[in-house]
Amino acid sequence: AAGQVFATLLLADKSGVALDPSAQDDRFPALNDLEPSSPDQAAMTLGTALFVPSTSNDQRLEPTHRSVAEYLAADWLGKQIDSRGLPLQRVLNLMLGFDGKAVPGLRGLYGWLALKSLKAQHGLIKNDPLTVALYSDPQPMDVEAKKLLLQEIYTQTAANPSVLWDLRGAENLTPLFQAELRNEYLKALLDPKRDDSTQTYVVFILK
């Protein structure tokens, strides 16, 4: 229930849920307006530590931690896509900007969805690998997904070396390394080219 509530709030760009009609506005709809599939369970979720009162009005609740909201929302969406027939494109229509990449406010949700939906994983990686690398945890991904992630990041840096600016936010990418990917790393490290895109990629994999 929490995952569905968070997914709806994030995709609709809402701040939280209003407990009282007097507290409702465009940023804080009533729970019923979110149309949860299990209204009683969703209402119980609002009473957990996942939500805290808004500083503007104690009759409004906000997610306690946005990162937790993104993770739980992605987990719920992943299950809907993989097992319940939710079309991925319907979700992407709400997540992507004019450039085809995740909009800034939904990059966390996008990154976690690439981990949580096996059906959508490769497509999400190909479309926006940097968001997946920076806003998710690649550690649980299988070797093929990690290999694809590395390859797509290289492709993007080759097309636009300025993505190094985004990569500065990557604190620790060791989850992307494992023995089976050794050749992928060696290929980049031994590449004789010294152009901007190649060096950008080498900086990325050495983080």
Regions found by a protein language model. Name each.
Residues 8, 16-19, 25-26, 45, ...:
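Hydrophobic repeat-domain scaffold segments
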Residues 1-81:
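Extended helical regulatory/linker subdomains that flank P-loop NTPase cores
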